[in-house]
Amino acid sequence: LLSNEDNYALKSLSVAGSKDLIEVSRGGTPTSPSYYIDGQLKAGYLFWHQDLVYTPSICKGSLLRMVEKCDVDGQTGWIDTAMVYDALSEEMKARIEGMEVRHRLRVTLDGVPFGLPASLREASQEEAPYTATTVPLLPDVVHPLVQVHPETGRKSLGISPLGLVDILGLPKAESDALLKERVAFTLQPRFMYIHEWQNNDMVAWDNRRTVHSVLGYPYGQKRIAHRATLAGEMHSGRYYEENANA
């Protein structure tokens, strides 16, 4: 297991008395904004992402256990980005080979440029009070757009929509257009698995070829889940340096 002591963002979510477990959902007052999606107010909504992609070394995987499920909704979804890559045209595979993508740590949807539901609107503090957590200011990180699994050699599409910034070396308009296309392609239901939780369910996944999302649940409901991060990293990235990447 990867110790939370090694990562500020994980350490801030640690389960009391544990250095290995984090609590990814809570009861009571949320620690992040809630959102209206299709007119329904939902807490706990976390957009599609790859864990620790905001660091140079992407973790091997994670293990998630549902301690107390909510009464309605609260599903978690996964997308197999190796399957996404396999579905690309040969022309697209050739085009994106060698491209690098800049990622940023985001814990809210502020600044997310691609793929958010059209109906999404952030609820105000008056509509859905929350206690904001302190987010560390970390440098952006660069990873390949085509990721290669360190054990199998299989390629996957390195798309983590929550933290995407741009593609290095491309004009902004071209970068935005390509990322918008690739995010829309990735978020097709045919690539998704949506899990309907029961208490004590456990799901493990290979983080090096997946992205996942918490689909939210009604504001005011309780949902508690614990996660352990699996050690064994994919050292595919580096910190972004503006002058070096100009």
Where are these regions (language model features)?
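Fe(II)/2-oxoglutarate oxygenase catalytic core
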Residues: L1-A204, R208-A246
